[in-house]
């Protein structure tokens, strides 16, 4: 059983390394041998579909898919248990339908993939039914634990019997499923989309993972309207992962993990300490400065909070800082990561908005520096008021030593940005280069990265990618409903009726995102609202590069605000303190962040000037 439980990890980790090798070969072949590989990109995308699906399966087993537990935490224990049982039933249905639609799309697939020697696209679509079967097995495993721990009323046996019955119907009497088509009994017309959206909101807020709730709502819509097109729509579940720009996401995740396991984060922190530690509020400045340096390598807020957080909090405690300020600065400074290039959030926005990822990377730099300076100003004020001590000023020898030790790590953002603008590699390939560079300095320079740790890091990155992959798949599916019913245009009409200028629209969007960010995870929020907000921005002639940075900052504020502020929970965990302590500490640091948001909203040129200058 131990080996079966590790199946996804071993297979996914191996495929992850295979993609890594293929893309390294692609870069070397083009830049060194001047002979581009025509098959590398297509093969990497094909393998990524499998890696993403395997990651979803791992997240199903570990029950790590993004969900909202704000309401369920307020419920009495018995009602919470009943609600969780209902949620698990819905997830079970989703996984079965993944298998069902996966088989149908696999059977219908017939086109060749020319770049891979004409092999059938069935190889892509096979990922959905094959790995969904593995998901079902993992789901039943998880239900065994849920039942034993009193989280569900239904034993795993119930789901096993139900699965057998449903598979028997699927293979021997598939027409029976036609009874589920609501349109056979009642015509709901244009109200169908509103019913689907209402159901989506209800089931999402009672704890159904966001990805699965999108899938259920969209299927409900199709059952009420156009079931005949559902097959074509479900193809998008797989094709959504067949994207070269998205390949950057898992490898920036891997880079962040390697920074922690390869001894890089500690050296970054020590360099920041030697530079800033002797000023008033020194260790707070070190915390913020280290986050700025780390953000140029990982592109993730939570990677910063989890990776540097423990180190930063310990150093601040040792220097005499109160726990609330230790946690507050650590949480607030982690939002610099998604603004300063490289940025996973910017990559996802670029894919959704079909905008230049390179321009988005450049556009986020100035706001990232502004937030850094604003946080330092607030830290200075608090340190002055509370009388926090300063560390002794580093000697020239200490400064040179810390710089020498961190030099190779500090080169990472320069390598990424320089490579993109010189044309040596694309933004996607920059993630591969960043990961490769992290391996080299972790293994051969700092000598703290082992082959076993490297493989385990690939597995961890694959598992995190699975959470993102489910969101990408189902939000693309959901987007088909939004497009068919022109929901985005209807929302835009409301904005047009209320707003009289682009600035008014931006204020309304900021207010909406700030409110939603209190309850919805930043990643989920990005996938859920951007497809509806981007058309509004276009209608008001708002620059989409500016819009991407503004919405990214807004969503990062969401990870700092209760009750769903993920950074608060991560920092509380790594700092061994309560969430309320972190929340208390982060409140004063929200002021400079809000001021920065207001500034860039009123003066979008702060964001657009540099990218327009460098990339006309």
From Swiss-Prot:
It is found in: Cell inner membrane. The chain crosses the membrane at residues 9-29, 36-56, 83-103, 117-137, 153-173, 195-215, 244-264, 288-308, 332-352, 357-377, 407-427, 431-451, 459-479, 505-525, 527-547, 552-572, 587-607. The keyword Ribosomal protein does not apply. The keyword Transport applies. Residues 191-616 are annotated as: TRAP transporter large permease. It is a multi-pass membrane protein. Residues 1-190 are annotated as: TRAP transporter small permease. Its main location: membrane. The complex comprises the extracytoplasmic solute receptor protein SiaP, and the fused transmembrane protein SiaT. This is Sialic acid TRAP transporter permease protein SiaT. The lineage of its organism: Bacteria, Pseudomonadati, Pseudomonadota, Gammaproteobacteria, Pasteurellales.
């Amino acid at each position: 059983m131990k080996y079966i439980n590790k199946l996804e990890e071993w297979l996914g980790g191996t495929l992850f390394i295979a993609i890594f090798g293929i893309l390294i070969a692609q870069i070397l072949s083009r830049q060194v041998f001047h002979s581009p590989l025509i098959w590398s990109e297509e093969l990497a995308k094909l393998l990524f579909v499998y890696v993403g699906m395997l990651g979803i399966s791992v997240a199903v087993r570990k029950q790590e898919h993004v969900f909202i537990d704000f309401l369920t935490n307020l419920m009495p224990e018995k009602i919470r248990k009943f609600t969780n049982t209902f949620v698990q039933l819905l997830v079970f249905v989703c996984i079965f339908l993944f298998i069902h639609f996966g088989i149908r799309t696999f059977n219908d697939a017939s086109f060749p993939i020319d770049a891979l020697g004409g092999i059938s696209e069935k190889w892509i679509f096979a990922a959905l039914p094959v790995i969904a079967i593995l998901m079902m097995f993992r789901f039943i495993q998880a239900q065994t634990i849920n039942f034993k721990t009193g989280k569900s009323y239904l034993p795993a046996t119930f789901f096993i019997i139900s699965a057998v019955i449903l598979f028997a119907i699927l293979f021997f009497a598939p027409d029976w499923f036609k009874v589920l088509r609501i349109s056979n009994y009642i015509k709901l017309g244009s109200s169908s989309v509103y019913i689907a959206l209402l159901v989506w909101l209800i089931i999402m807020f009672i704890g159904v993972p966001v990805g699965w709730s999108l899938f259920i709502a969209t299927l409900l819509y199709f059952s009420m309207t156009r079931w005949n097109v559902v097959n074509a729509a479900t193809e998008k579940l797989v094709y959504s992962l067949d994207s070269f720009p998205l390949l950057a996401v898992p490898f920036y995740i891997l880079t962040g993990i390697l920074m922690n396991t390869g001894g890089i984060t500690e050296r970054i922190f020590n360099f920041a300490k030697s530079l800033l530690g002797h000023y008033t509020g020194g260790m707070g400045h070190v915390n913020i400065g280290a986050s700025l340096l780390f953000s140029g390598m990982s592109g993730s807020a939570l990677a910063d909070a989890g990776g540097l957080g423990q180190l930063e909090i310990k150093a601040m405690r040792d220097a005499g800082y109160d726990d609330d300020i230790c946690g507050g600065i650590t949480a607030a400074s982690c939002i610099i990561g998604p603004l300063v290039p490289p940025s996973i959030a910017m990559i996802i926005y670029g894919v959704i908005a079909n905008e230049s990822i390179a321009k988005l990377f450049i556009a986020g730099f100035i706001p990232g520096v502004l937030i850094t300076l604003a946080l330092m100003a607030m830290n200075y004020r608090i340190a002055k008021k509370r009388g926090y001590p300063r560390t002794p000023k580093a000697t020239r020898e200490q400064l040179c030593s810390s710089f020498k030790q961190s030099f190779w790590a500090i080169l990472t953002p320069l390598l990424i940005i320089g490579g993109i603008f010189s044309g040596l590699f694309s933004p996607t390939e920059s993630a591969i280069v960043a990961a490769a560079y992290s391996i080299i300095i972790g293994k051969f320079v700092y000598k703290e990265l082992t082959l076993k740790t490297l493989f385990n890091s690939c597995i961890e990155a694959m598992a995190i990618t699975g959470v993102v992959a489910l969101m990408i798949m189902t939000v693309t599916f959901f987007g088909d409903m939004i497009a068919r019913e022109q929901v985005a245009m209807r929302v835009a009409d409301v904005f047009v009726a209320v707003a009289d200028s682009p600035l008014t629209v931006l204020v309304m969007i900021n207010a909406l995102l700030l409110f939603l960010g209190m309850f919805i995870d930043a990643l989920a929020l990005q996938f859920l609202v951007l497809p509806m907000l981007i058309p509004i921005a276009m209608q008001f002639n708002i620059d989409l590069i500016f819009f991407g940075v503004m919405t990214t900052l807004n969503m990062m504020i969401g990870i700092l605000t209760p009750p769903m502020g993920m950074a608060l929970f991560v920092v509380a965990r790594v700092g061994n303190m309560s969430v309320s302590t972190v929340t208390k500490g982060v409140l004063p640091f929200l002021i400079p962040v809000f001021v920065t948001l207001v500034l860039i909203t009123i003066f979008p040129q702060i964001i657009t000037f540099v990218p327009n200058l460098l990339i006309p």
